[in-house]
């Protein structure tokens, strides 16, 4: 059974990746908005924001990476919705394949596509002056956090992808996720925010994830932020996975 699951997932993953390679505009579109935001904030607003001794592009990049992921998962919900409405799921049910492999293929496709978009954003940031003296372990830690964050949000995307009534509804859920970094330490230090906004910003998941990635990039002590970030990512992943699988089983039953 396990062997069939991995084999079926690999085949379906190949199918999804072929769709992406035939329309690379998906990845380009995902990366364009975060890159445009990075350009605007660095070159238009960056001079007015005090981030201490850290250059603004270095300060900003962790938040932009999270926005890139939040933008990318909308396409996961979109692809799931199209497959669901197109009868692909019913066709797969009539075949001798592991049922959960269909969802895992979409999730892994999201992970691959978002990883490519993240690399593109980092390359643009390097052209804009981003520099990090972080070693290989720190970069691997950043990659691990981003992978967990992507998986958590992708399983969240599965839920509207399966249950939405329209294609617009399937992808619209990502809008609040894209907005969330604006109420965090992603763009400005939280100590510059008004009381209630600051309280919210300091206790929502994006701030701890951004702070952990920023500390890793700048080789500063990560403190408790990395554990809080991991707890948020793992917690969201567990909850969204459970809800997504429940939604999927209800849909195919």
Place the predicted regions along the sequence by residue.
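Short cytosolic juxtamembrane segments of multi-pass membrane proteins
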Residues: 246-253
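Transmembrane helix segments
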Residues: 41-48, 161-203, 207
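Short helix-capping/hinge motifs at transmembrane helix termini and TM-loop junctions
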Residues: 41-50, 71, 125-133, 137, ...
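Membrane-interfacial helix-loop-helix junctions in multi-pass membrane proteins
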Residues: 19, 50-51, 133, 184-239
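Aromatic- and glycine-rich beta-strand/loop motifs that create alpha-glucan
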Residues: 1-33
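Short, membrane-interfacial amphipathic segments enriched in basic
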Residues: 1-13, 153, 196-207
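Alpha-helical transmembrane segments and their short interhelical loops
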Residues: 99-174, 221-245
